[in-house]
């Protein structure tokens, strides 16, 4: 894998699961989950390239001072701290990405993974797990520019 910058323009996006084509990353009541699409700001994510770190940061449009980050247990959550909030979206197809962390020594080791419960990802956590796989639809996300 190349560590070169994936070209993604700064701006607002919706993050859709490839696993279930109609579900979008949503921030609601203090947690993240994948829900059916809506026009609400809690399903819109501001993507910003941070040149000093050579990584991207996602903030929620409804909560602009909070960033997608991961904790010591591997859960991805919305944090008011910018710690553990830099990501490297690796393009694998048109508008399709595996999103890896920049905060761990080997950039390509850890990636967003949607936990599924018997093929149902609704209300399931998003994890930052090792060993990403381009054939694992639970790790592939579509970024739809708004």
Swiss-Prot record:
Please provide, in alphabetical order, the Gene Ontology terms of the cellular component aspect for this entry: extracellular region
* Cellular compartments annotated: Secreted
Q: Which gene encodes it?
A: ha-17
Question: What does the record give as the function of this protein?
Answer: The hemagglutinin (HA) component of the progenitor toxin protects the structural integrity of the neurotoxin; may increase internalization of the neurotoxin into the bloodstream of the host. Involved in binding to the small intestine through interactions with glycolipids and glycoproteins containing sialic acid moieties. The hemagglutinin complex composed of HA-70, HA-33 and HA-17 agglutinates erythrocytes, whereas the individual compenents do not. Erythrocyte agglutination also occurs with the entire toxin complex.
Instruction: Tell me the organism.
Output: Clostridium botulinum D phage (Clostridium botulinum D bacteriophage)
* CDD domains reported in the protein's UniProt record: beta-trefoil_Ricin_HA17 (cd23494)
This protein is called Hemagglutinin component HA-17 type D
Q: How does it assemble?
A: Botulinum toxins are produced as large progenitor toxins of 12S (M toxin, about 280 kDa) and 16S (L toxin, about 650 kDa). M toxin consists of a non-toxic, non-hemagglutinin component (NTNHA) and the neurotoxin (BoNT/D). L toxin consists of the M toxin and the 3 hemagglutinin (HA) subcomponents of 70, 33, and 17 kDa. The stoichiometry of the whole complex has been modeled as one BoNT/D, one NTNHA, three HA-70, six HA-33 and three HA-17. HA-33 and HA-17 crystallize as a heterotrimer with two HA-33 and one HA-17.
| A matching Pfam family | Botulinum_HA-17
Residue pairs linked by disulfide bridges in the UniProt entry: none
**What other facts are recorded?**
This protein can also be encoded on a prophage.
Under InterPro entries, the record lists:
HA-17_C_botulinum (IPR008903), Ricin_B-like_lectins (IPR035992)
Q: Which UniProt keywords apply?
A: Hemagglutinin, Secreted, Virulence
């Amino acid at each position: 894998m190349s560590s070169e910058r994936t070209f993604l323009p700064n701006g607002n996006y919706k993050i859709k699961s490839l696993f279930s084509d109609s579900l979008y990353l949503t921030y609601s009541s203090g947690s993240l989950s994948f829900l059916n699409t809506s026009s609400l700001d809690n399903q819109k994510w501001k993507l910003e390239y941070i040149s000093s770190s050579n990584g991207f940061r996602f903030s929620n449009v409804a909560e602009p001072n909070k960033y997608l980050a991961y904790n010591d247990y591997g859960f991805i959550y919305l944090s008011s701290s910018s710690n553990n909030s830099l990501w490297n979206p690796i393009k694998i197809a048109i508008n399709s990405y595996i999103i890896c962390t920049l905060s761990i020594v080997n950039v390509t080791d850890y990636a967003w993974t949607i936990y599924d419960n018997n093929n149902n990802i609704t209300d399931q956590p998003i994890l930052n797990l090792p060993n990403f796989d381009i054939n694992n639809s639970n790790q592939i996300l579509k970024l739809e520019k708004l």
